[in-house]
Amino acid sequence: MSSATTPPDSDPAQRRRVHSMLKLYYGLNEEGKATEQAESLDPCDINGPHFDPEIYLNKLRKECSLTELMDHESCMVKQIRSLDSDMQTLVYENYNKFISATDTIRKMKNDFKKMEDEMDCLSANMAAITEFSARISGTLQDQHAQITKLSGVHTLLRKLQFLFELPARLNKCLELQAYAQAVSSHRRARCVLQQYSHMPSFRGIQDDCHVIMEQLAQQLRQKFRDGGSSAKDLSECVELLLQLDEPAEELCDKFLSHAQSRLEADLQGLEAELKDSAVTDTGAGSVQKTSPGSNPVSPSSSVSNPFLSPAAGTDILEFIDRGCNEFVSNLCLVIASYQELFINRPQESELASKNIPEMANGKLHVFVDTLAARYFSLVERRIQEEKGVGDNSLLVRALDRFHRRLQAISKLLPGSAVPSQGTEIVVRAARERIKQYLSALQTFYHDSLTDVRQALAAPRLSVGGASASGGGALVGGASSKDAPPSLPELLTSLSNFILNQLKSVLASVHLFTAKDITFSNKPYFKGEFCSQGVREGLVVSFIKFICQSSRQYCESAGDRGGSTPPALLLLLSRLCLDYETSTISYILTLTDEQFLVQHHTPVTPVTALCAEAREAAQKLLNHYVKVQGLIISQMLRKSVETRDWVNTIEPRNVRAVMKRVVEDTTSIDVQVGLLYEEGVRKAHSSDSSKRTFSVYSSSRQQIRYAPSYTPSAPMDTNLLSNIHKLFSERIDIFSPVEFNKVSVLTGIIKISLKTFLECVRLRTFGRYGLQQIQVDCHYLQMYLWRFVSDENLVHFLLDEIVGSAAHRCLDPSPMEQSVIEVICERG
């Protein structure tokens, strides 16, 4: 019936919406109670109790237009219809619920009637049971004491039977090797036999049991001494012997001695593996040394590359796995068994006073520390064999596994120093790894410079900056055979190789601080390892090494430049300058971001490293200028010292050495221009190549070399020359060089011309010797002025050379300027 009267619109969401609207209308909350709201006194509030329809209608007529009134009427009609529909729906629903509730109440009445009948029946049965129980208790009241006595006698007889059968039972257990059952049976009867030992029958049983238990104890001791017993059997033996009142201290020593023999076997296996690995390494090393046709030393060569791991029979991860799975696991099992037997075992009253747990705990600590020290020494020996730094992940994973497995000992044996000692081994391994990486980077840098030197030692760099192909990875691949690398290419390759190798090293070292590594959350790896280890010990040390090793090329070279190619000095100076401008900041920023370096401890600032790199670059560039200047000076000195300037013939050509000087200077200009910017020059005159020689024929030199040359003329010319020097600008020959091409060439030319000047001052010239010097100086002036920052510098030095030659000339008759120009143009 209820289903027939249910309206078709029975959607739960629709019903909830209707209920909420009605509750809102009647002012009810969710629990169906009227909400306590302040009554509205507004007669225009249609929902208020004081609503006055007349006032409300008058207000609407005043405030609203006809259209608004009609709309308001339509809205109210819709609301009334909606509420009417909702009310009908609720009436239908409540009617159905009322009918359903009536049916439910009718069913409950029928059920309760049946339940009352069953309860009456149960009450009658309980009364009958109570009456029957009272009747039985009354009947047995007189025989209760007799039954209790008979039960006690029966129990005593069973105990006596157990005592009389005990020797046979113990012998049977001894034959079946059921030692635990025998000990348990004897412990149950021991107190009774001891109490009634004065009775002959019990005394005999006690003696027989004592003999049998002595045999059992002897077998347990023998089983305890045998090395083939498992850990479970060993623990059972110890527990049974303790129950047989064996001395606890002696049992501790025997247990640890037996366990030590097994652990010693594990350590000997690890040590044998170390020896096999050492033999394998020695054999592999001898093969490498004697291998024929090995490639030249280069970073890409597998023979000398420090980033390749040496061949070994077993890698370190397998070694650590074996140590953890065998030694550490067995040690943890021994600790757990020992603690369960001697330390955590409940002590009986007579044993509690002997402080067995304290004694056993002390012996256990000594035992664990001794064996762990031997194990740690083997682990450190194996870590030290990891000389190659090619694959750092194996070492980090091995150290992580080593550290992780040692944490089990800290849980089993609180207060043990073994876990902290293991952490110290990991820390030392990380420090040693950083040193190895630093050494490998240094070796790689030296090998890279060897490649550069080989590339420079092949057919020398032409004026275009190209050279023949050299060996090693820096020279390039197959394309390098057709197009030898230029200085910029060598610089770029060297810089990229160093930077990429350093990034690779940082990525390898970063494995020590990975989130999945257990020891990475230790304070050392969060602080000191990142700041002092990686940043200072690796990155900063490597940058300082680059600067220091570069400066050594200046210190080791002699006055003639040693064996270091000048192009290498120039390239290294540019490399250090690039480090000062950008590379150092980039590397340190990368390191700080990658390792989250916390600058709690003093670290080297970027500015200090940049200053050191700039100092190295300045020193290298100064030395390059000095070396190149001395090379040209050597040619000029030999050309002056090996010539007879008094008896020479009349000059017809420019000397070949002057042409060589100009050619070498031009080559140096191109070479320096490949790596450094042009620089700033002073404004040049349009006739610089000629104006210099006009200085030679100036009024001062006309006074010097006039045909009316008299003995007093040298005094006048000397005076004028000295006065001219007083007012001329001082020239510093070995002044610091700026990082540009013009400054470098200026320094080289100053050294060369100054040497030329000093050599001229030491020689004596004839007439044609002076004229040859004039021709040579004019030729130099025609070409050298364009290389320097200030052409007046060249004018002054060449003027000094000609003037010194005139002072040292026996017959100072200068050549006509036009003749000099013709000879130089023809030359």
UniProtKB/Swiss-Prot annotation:
Compositionally biased region (Polar residues): 279-290
Residue segments, region Disordered: 279-304
CC terms in the record's Gene Ontology section: cytosol; EARP complex; GARP complex; membrane; recycling endosome
SUPFAM superfamilies, sorted: Cullin repeat-like
PANTHER family: VACUOLAR PROTEIN SORTING-ASSOCIATED PROTEIN 51 HOMOLOG
Membership in a protein family: Belongs to the VPS51 family.
Function: Involved in retrograde transport from early and late endosomes to the late Golgi. The GARP complex is required for the maintenance of protein retrieval from endosomes to the TGN, acid hydrolase sorting, lysosome function, endosomal cholesterol traffic and autophagy. Acts as a component of the EARP complex that is involved in endocytic recycling.
Name this protein carries in UniProt: Vacuolar protein sorting-associated protein 51 homolog
